[in-house]
Amino acid sequence: MKNTILSFLLILFTTNAFSQENPIIYFDYVTVLNTDVEKHIEAEKNVFSKMHKEQIDMGNKIGWDMWQISNNSYGEPTTTFLYVHIQPGSGFSNEPSKIFSEYEIQEHQKQYADRIVKTGNLTLSLKGSYGIKPGQKPFNYLVTNYMVVDPYKSYEYEQMELKSAGPNYAQNGRLGWGLAKVISRFGTDHEVNYLTFDFYKSMDEILNARSTTIKFTKSQMALWRSYDKLRELKNSHIMTLIAAER
């Protein structure tokens, strides 16, 4: 597994990419032991974030974020981080680092791999956003919603989100909103095929939005039920921003 992680890290900083109109977003989920969280964050801020910033300044990528998932199960011995790589195309185009030697990079990558318990990934195509752009640093708190959509209703679902949910993003204290389609997984074993993103200023605003009980009118209830016929919410992650580079 560690060899796989090291191989991925090498690809991350050496693979060529081609340009594309819409940015591609790579999600990497990385789980570490709770006892390693502090040193993991320190390494990301002091080493890897600088490497990503260097590539951004060279024009090889649009952005990089590190998020910590806050709603892990009670008593979990691990913590999961989400890394967001925003690319102009379908891969990673990187030039050799001028701030770290090859030896330093290899040592940091080895230490990184030694901390990892498990990993996962998604490749996404950004469909649209309101209140925030890919080239802007994100707000400090994020709720990511994992949606299951009937493939035959994908267009109808996208239009509903982009024309109804997106323009009304400011409701419930949201500062920004986005929609992305999963393009790396297909088939019945991978139900989730869309993600929505709700950005907030504080954790209190997220909790307030979730604790508020709304009394729907008949028309509102009918509208929301029509939305639910297009999508099914499978999971939701509350995340705190740890680091970001643009």
Enumerate the language-model features and the residues they cover.
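Bacterial Sec-dependent N-terminal signal peptides
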Residues: 1-22
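Short S/T/G/P-rich N-terminal loop/turn motif that feeds into the first structured element of a domain
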Residues: 19-246
